[in-house]
Amino acid sequence: MSPYDYRLEKGLISFLNKVYKKNKTLYEAAMKKIEDIAENPYHYKPLRHDLKGRRRVHIEKSFVLTFRIDEQEKRVTFLDLCHHDSVYKKR
């Protein structure tokens, strides 16, 4: 069992379901990375400015998985998986 529990936002679940049908390699990479992050979420880069409080990790060069850590609940909430350009435009 992971040191941190985790959950996925509804929008991320929907996106992953679509990715599963179209690009299983990306889906598998994302799911593996989610498990890795739950083991040690502080290993990954914290974001700044408008995205402060979130962290990110790149998946397959072009995609970014964003998440936040709730230390009191020992939970990682995965927020979004988007193309790199889209993530930083959402600010």
Question: Which residues does each predicted region cover?
Answer:
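A short, surface-exposed loop/turn module that caps and links secondary-structure elements
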Residues: 32-58
